[in-house]
Amino acid sequence: MALIVSKFGGTSVASPERIKNVAKRLIAMKQEGNDVVAVVSAMGKTTDELVGLAAALNDHPSKREMDMLLSTGEQVSMSLLAMAIQALGYNSISFTGWQAGITTDDVFSSAKIEDINADRIRGALDTGAIVVVAATD
């Protein structure tokens, strides 16, 4: 059994129909006997919309608050994809990067990964789940 990690950008998850298509692709990988992890970005133009909202409120928002705001786009995508997989009859769980065991430095807006503790992801895979992780690019 192989471990397959696939990254899906904003265009791939830009609409409910596209999310369903991604879910079907991931399920096909699972049906081939693989452990499957998907990493997803925010839907379509979500990041641009969030940046616009921030700009409407503050000409110079802090990098920390921008990181917090922008991470919500990925959280929406990860949850919707897990729901789509579940609707097709398969076990799925979503994680933020932090929940998945990814630790970064504290350089806001350009953090680097310092450590990955894959125990939580491995535990979910061991239950047969398709794991969906929010990207933090």
Each predicted region: which residue ranges?
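Nucleotide/pyrophosphate-binding catalytic subdomain
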Residues: 1-137
